[in-house]
UniProtKB/Swiss-Prot annotation:
Specifically methylates the N4 position of cytidine in position 1402 (C1402) of 16S rRNA. PANTHER family: 12S RRNA N4-METHYLCYTIDINE METHYLTRANSFERASE, S-ADENOSYL-METHYLTRANSFERASE MRAW. One of its GO terms (biological process) is rRNA base methylation. This is Ribosomal RNA small subunit methyltransferase H. S-adenosyl-L-methionine binds at residues 35-37, 55, 84, 105, 112. Its EC number is 2.1.1.199. It comes from Streptococcus pneumoniae serotype 19F (strain G54). It catalyses: cytidine(1402) in 16S rRNA + S-adenosyl-L-methionine = N(4)-methylcytidine(1402) in 16S rRNA + S-adenosyl-L-homocysteine + H(+). Belongs to the methyltransferase superfamily. RsmH family. It is found in: Cytoplasm. It comes from the Bacteria. The gene is rsmH.
Amino acid sequence: MTKEFHHVTVLLHETIDMLDVKPDGIYVDATLGGAGHSEYLLSKLSEKGHLYAFDQDQNAIDNAQKRLAPYIEKGMVTFIKDNFRHLQARLREAGVQEIDGICYDLGVSSPQLDQRERGFSYKKDAPLDMRMNQDASLTAYEVVNHYDYHDLVRIFFKYGEDKFSKQIARKIEQAREVKPIETTTELAEIIKLVKPAKELKKKGHPAKQIFQAIRIEVNDELGAADESIQQAMDMLALDGRISVITFHSLEDRLTKQLFKEASTVEVPKGLPFIPDDLKPKMELVSRKPILPSAEELEANNRSHSAKLRVARKIHK
């Protein structure tokens, strides 16, 4: 049975308005989710325009088919159930060579967080899962119970940036020798045992960074985003734009670096002009990330860490 998606879209107007939508253009929503960005983008297209919407979660696609029904009836939407790391291949299969714009809303969606059985949340007791694609084989249970100490430390440091990574990895090792760690609550309690009292008093849940690290590992989120954003920039038509919303420093750092590499060039000294093959292919639309307004921050708590970066294709 399809579960309802209740998702408040973050930076809705900013993300789509910054794409400078062409009514007859071809656009991509790389992270369909609750379909908020897709719906607003479609409202700016003529019936000659088209949207390709990616999601690896069938539940998201099922719900979007209801929300976007008026546009589907006009033949303006194509859903692609796949990881966005396969963006270029899947669009080529659909006969698309160039796109006029693309948006990303990275990370886990509100409905995935809110569905207890998906195992994303440290606030709700559930089996350790955390798969965005429920057909995938690697789960949080596998990571927590079968990764060795060194691999746990690696992902906790790299993806969670938690200064207690070694102690938490050791405590997990000790706990699973007694019995497997099966639920989100069990894992959260183990993490709490390691954190000193002053850490537990800080704002935010003590397990947040470790849960983030495991989720990124299970879904290879940063690897997928890296590949996909580079493919997207390659596929953009001249003057096409890319909008990327991030929710934590690792995603934002990655996006900032990819945009920087595509929008700058190191020219050898002595060259009288820049050869075409050395010219940067992108330019930043906004030097600094765009942040949610005060009104949005008040209305949607999950928007607090959101940042939007936008770039434009200036050279093929």
